[in-house]
C-alpha cells in the first residue's frame, strides 16, 4: 500500500538511494532539507518532494509531519566541531527528541531510525550519542524500528572511495588502528532493509544489526582498495600512541579526514552478532561483487577531470 513518508537526511549517501527506491515503490516521499536550492525538484524522481525546513525547530517539524504515515530519520554525523560531544548530541540525541515530539504532536505513529552498530557500547562521543538517541526512540511510545549498520559502502561512499583518493596522494599510508575490524554492509542492502521494515508490521519494536558477510581489518580494506586500483602502496600500521597523535593533528585539519573521536570509535570492532539482514530475508552482498564498480566509478571521474584539465588548463 502506498504510504506518505517524510525523510530526514534524505539527501545524504543512504538517503538519496532510499528516497529513490521508496518513490519507485509508489510511496509519496517528502524530503526535508535546509536548502531547497541545492536539491531542485526537477532532478528528483517522480513522487519525491523537497521542503525547506529547520529540522531543529520542533514546531516546523510538526507542520511537516502532519498527514504523514511514517517518518524516517537518517540524520547522522561522523565528526563535530571541537571534541566535547556537543555536536554529536545535537545531531543525534536532541534532533531525535524533536522528531519524537513532532511525531506525537502530528499524530504520526511509525518511526524508522538510523543508528549504528555498537550504539551505546563504545568510548567515542559518536557511539555514546547513538546509544542515547536509541533510548529516546525506545521510550517514545511510537511504533519504532531501529537500524544499526556497520560501515556502509557503495558508489560514492566514505570508505573505499575515500581511501582510493588518499592512496593517490602518497606511496605510504600511516594507518591508526590498522587491526580494527569491520563487516561492511552494501548501501543497497541497507535500503532494502528500510524498505522491507516499512512494509512489515513485525519489524515494530525491533533493532536490526546490518552487516556484511565478510569481516576485514582496516588495513585489509586499504590493501583491497590499492589492489583494485592497480597501485602498490606501503601501509604503515601505527601503534596507538602515534595513532592518537595522528588523530589529534587531524582534529585541526579542515574537513577532519580523521579525528580523535574516530580513533575512539575504532577501539570497538564494527562487527555484529545477530544478522538483521537475514532476519528481514535479505542475502547480504559481498564486497568483491561491488568493489570494481565503486573504484571504477571513481577512476572514471578522475579520468574525466584529467581530460578536462588537459583541454582547459
Predicted stretch roles:
Residues 2-27:
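N-terminal Rossmann NAD(P)H-binding glycine-rich loop of SDR-like oxidoreductase domains
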Residues 27-34:
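Conserved glycine-rich Rossmann-like NAD(P)H-binding loop of the short-chain dehydrogenase/reductase
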Residues 38-98, 102-105, 117-122:
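NAD(P)H-binding glycine-rich loop region in Rossmannoid oxidoreductase-like domains
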Residues 89-93, 112, 130:
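Short alpha-helix in the Rossmann-fold core of NAD(P)-dependent oxidoreductases
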Residues 115, 134-158, 165:
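Conserved beta-loop-beta element that borders a ligand/cofactor-binding pocket
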Residues 158-159, 177-199, 206-209:
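Substrate-positioning beta->alpha
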Residues 196-259, 272-313:
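Mid/C-terminal beta-alpha module of Rossmann-like enzyme folds, strongest
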Amino acid at each position: 500500500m502506498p504510504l506518505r513518508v517524510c525523510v530526514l537526511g534524505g539527501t545524504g549517501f543512504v538517503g538519496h538511494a532510499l528516497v529513490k527506491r521508496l518513490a519507485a515503490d509508489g510511496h509519496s516521499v517528502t524530503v526535508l532539507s535546509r536548502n531547497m536550492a541545492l536539491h531542485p525538484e526537477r532532478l528528483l524522481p517522480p513522487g519525491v518532494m523537497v521542503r525547506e525546513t529547520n529540522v531543529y525547530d520542533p514546531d516546523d517539524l510538526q507542520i511537516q509531519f502532519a498527514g504523514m504515515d511514517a517518518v524516517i530519520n537518517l540524520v547522522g554525523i561522523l565528526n563535530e566541531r571541537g571534541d566535547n560531544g556537543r555536536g554529536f548530541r545535537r545531531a543525534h540525541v536532541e534532533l531525535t527528541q524533536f522528531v519524537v515530539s513532532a511525531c506525537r504532536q502530528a499524530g504520526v505513529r511509525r518511526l524508522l531510525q538510523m543508528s549504528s552498530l555498537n550504539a551505546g557500547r563504545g568510548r567515542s562521543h559518536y557511539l555514546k550519542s547513538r546509544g542515547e538517541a536509541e533510548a529516546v526512540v525506545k521510550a517514545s511510545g511510537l511504533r519504532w524500528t531501529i537500524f544499526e549498520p556497520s560501515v556502509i559502502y557503495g558508489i560514492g561512499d566514505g570508505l573505499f572511495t575515500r581511501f582510493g583518493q588518499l592512496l593517490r596522494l602518497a606511496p605510504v599510508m600511516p594507518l591508526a588502528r590498522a587491526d580494527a575490524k569491520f563487516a561492511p554492509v552494501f548501501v543497497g542492502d541497507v535500503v532494502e532493509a528500510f524498505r522491507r521494515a516499512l512494509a512489515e508490521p513485525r519489524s515494530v519494536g525491533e533493532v536490526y544489526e546490518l552487516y556484511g558477510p565478510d569481516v576485514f581489518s582496516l588495513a585489509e580494506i586499504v590493501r583491497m582498495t590499492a589492489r583494485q586500483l592497480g597501485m602498490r602502496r606501503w601501509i604503515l600500521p601505527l601503534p596507538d600512541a602515534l595513532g592518537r597523535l595522528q588523530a589529534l593533528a587531524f582534529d585541526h585539519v579542515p574537513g577532519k579526514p580523521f579525528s580523535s573521536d574516530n580513533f575512539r570509535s575504532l577501539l570497538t570492532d564494527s562487527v555484529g552478532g545477530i544478522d538483521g539482514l537475514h532476519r528481514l530475508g535479505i542475502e547480504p552482498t559481498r564486497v568483491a561483487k561491488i568493489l570494481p564498480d565503486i573504484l571504477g566509478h571513481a577512476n572514471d571521474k578522475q579520468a574525466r577531470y584529467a581530460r578536462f584539465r588537459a583541454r582547459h588548463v
